[in-house]
């Protein structure tokens, strides 16, 4: 496979062409990744039962925490790689690659050990009941066992994309997606492994994709590659990776905290069925947010390179185009949630499975309408937060990430449900989205004004 876009062209090609070239592969990959999570849930819902969906939903906080550590390394390394290439420092970019490998081994090994040791107490804290903890435990034991594979696969894929190979990054991710979709029904229905089969399919598919990534960086045709001497931790590189990736890390941690509070509230006011309904809503929303994430991934190397080269006019242009596309995506999600909520919920659960299944469908349909009611502006808020991260301003990105989850959403989740029940849980989310988007607009306004007043100002990182 030939190199899709050389780093040097990031500073000269048309922004719209670059965004399409980088974003489309990322969108396809991220959407496919979200779709196979949806397919997992559909197979689990129809092959194991509606309460099994609740068990997987209870696993989401722990999976988000695992993703937090993966994002801390992967997103930080990708942004730093783009900036180093924009500065013309190819060897420094390869040093980042070496640090990524070592950091993933250390962090993932520690997370796996702690997670497996304390799994049952963690799941009970997350809101598991006697009916759901068995499903959650069976699923997470295998997912935790594959944490090193997952972290390494996702981090290296980020660096592949950031170093000028968006199509190859897409192909690698699609490899995992296709294998997962093939293995899931085989393991769940063919081998009768149930929910453990779904987890095993995910880990094995990612292991296959990781092997392709390792081959890429071992090839002499890669712009940056594995070399002798790069596999040593450098405090300065690790510090910058963590600094840039901290916003994504905190966002995932906050997302975990939110899901924990949501699950606890739903268990109190709606029971296990309501938790499963939230699992459905979460996966539907994530389908559209993964498309926005693909747009952000396409934006990242273009922003990082041109920011490193001090081409601020191009930075603003790609930001504007990305925001427009993101708002269109989330508006589509809004329309789906308002027009076809019950039909969407029935994809995951068969109403013929009994009263619990029908209750889950009805609860999910109500939640979809409310949770997605301000979804159009969510795309803008997410792009803005990522933009600050990509230009090396992690403090602003962290602030935006924290305020939506911690300052607005969690307090609302603590205040509204005692008065409104499950309705209060659903209402908390769009209220938090609206206020966070307004705050993001204010910060972005001042940042854009700085760029326009100082078009050639230097910024080191």
Residue ranges and their predicted role:
Residues 1-23, 81-148, 190-246, 303-374, ...:
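Short alpha-helical transmembrane segments in multi-pass integral membrane proteins
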Residues 12, 16-35, 39, 62-69, ...:
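Residue-level signal for short hydrophobic patches within transmembrane helices
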Residues 21-40, 142, 176, 205-209, ...:
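Transmembrane helical elements of multi-pass membrane transporters/channels
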Residues 35-54, 123-130, 186-193, 253-283, ...:
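Helix-terminus/linker motif at the lipid-water interface of multi-pass membrane proteins
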Residues 53-113, 150-169, 278-341, 378-397:
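Small-residue-rich hydrophobic transmembrane alpha-helices
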Residues 65-68, 112, 180-184, 210-214, ...:
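Hydrophobic transmembrane alpha-helices of multi-pass small-molecule transporters
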Residues 143-161, 172-180, 198-211, 296, ...:
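Short runs within selected transmembrane alpha-helices of multi-pass transporters and secretion channels
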């Amino acid at each position: 496979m030939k190199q899709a876009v050389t780093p040097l062209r990031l500073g000269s090609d048309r922004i719209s062409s670059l965004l399409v070239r980088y974003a489309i592969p990322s969108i396809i990959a991220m959407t496919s990744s979200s779709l196979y999570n949806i397919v997992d849930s559909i197979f689990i819902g129809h092959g194991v039962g509606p309460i099994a969906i609740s068990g997987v939903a209870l696993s989401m906080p722990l999976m988000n925490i695992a993703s937090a550590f993966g994002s801390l390394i992967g997103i930080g390394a990708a942004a730093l790689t783009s900036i180093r290439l924009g500065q013309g420092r190819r060897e420094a970019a390869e040093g980042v690659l070496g640090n990524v490998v070592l950091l993933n081994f250390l962090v993932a090994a520690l997370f796996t050990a702690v997670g497996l040791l304390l799994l049952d107490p963690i799941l009970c804290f997350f809101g598991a009941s006697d009916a759901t903890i068995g499903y959650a435990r069976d699923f997470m034991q295998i997912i935790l066992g594959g944490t090193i594979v997952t972290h390494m696969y996702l981090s290296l894929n980020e660096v592949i994309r950031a170093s000028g190979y968006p199509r190859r990054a897409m192909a690698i991710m699609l490899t995992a997606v296709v294998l997962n979709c093939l293995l899931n029904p085989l393991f769940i229905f063919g081998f009768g492994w149930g929910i453990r089969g779904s987890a095993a399919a995910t880990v094995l598919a990612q292991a296959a994709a990781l092997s392709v990534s390792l081959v890429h960086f071992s090839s002499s045709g890669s712009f940056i590659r594995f070399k002798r001497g790069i596999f040593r931790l450098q405090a300065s590189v690790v510090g910058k990776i963590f600094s840039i990736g901290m916003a994504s890390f905190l966002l995932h941690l906050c997302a975990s905290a939110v899901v924990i509070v949501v699950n606890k509230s739903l268990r109190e006011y709606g029971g296990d069925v309501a938790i499963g309904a939230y699992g459905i809503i979460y996966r539907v929303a994530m389908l559209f947010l993964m498309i926005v994430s693909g747009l952000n991934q396409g934006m990242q190397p273009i922003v990082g390179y041109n920011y490193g080269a001090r081409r601020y006019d191009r930075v603003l242009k790609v930001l504007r185009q990305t925001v427009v596309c993101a708002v269109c995506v989330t508006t589509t999600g809004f329309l789906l949630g308002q027009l076809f909520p019950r039909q969407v919920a029935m994809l995951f659960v068969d109403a013929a499975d009994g009263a619990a299944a029908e209750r889950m469908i009805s609860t999910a349909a109500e939640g979809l309408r409310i949770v997605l009611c301000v979804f159009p502006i969510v795309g803008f808020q997410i792009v803005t937060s990522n933009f600050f991260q990509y230009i090396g301003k992690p403090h602003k990105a962290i602030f935006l990430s924290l305020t939506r989850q911690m300052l607005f959403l969690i307090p609302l989740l603590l205040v509204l449900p005692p008065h409104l029940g499950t309705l209060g849980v659903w209402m908390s989310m769009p209220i938090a989205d609206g206020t966070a988007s307004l705050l993001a607009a204010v910060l972005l306004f001042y940042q854009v004004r700085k760029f326009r007043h100082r078009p050639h100002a230097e910024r080191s990182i």
